[in-house]
């Protein structure tokens, strides 16, 4: 399989986890996903009162500078770790 196909499959598989991962795990996965699909963050930081939006922005911003390919590899690795931990 190609890297893109592996990434797409991992993105589908994490939606099927038997239980919800911890918030930190979800934020890391989100940041890697956005970096894989879009690249470096291209939106302004949300207002302080938008806690969920700010957390997502920060998770994506942490991945800034990572190439899309490296982000995909990291996403796949994290997805496999979560699948092993939580099952599908």
Swiss-Prot record:
One of its GO terms (biological process) is G protein-coupled receptor signaling pathway. Residues 3-88 form the ACB domain. An acyl-CoA binds at residues 15, 30-34, 56, 75. It comes from the Eukaryota. GO terms for molecular function: fatty-acyl-CoA binding. Keywords: Lipid-binding. Binds medium- and long-chain acyl-CoA esters. This is Acyl-CoA-binding domain-containing protein 7. It comes from Mus musculus (Mouse). The lineage of its organism: Eukaryota, Metazoa, Chordata, Craniata, Vertebrata.
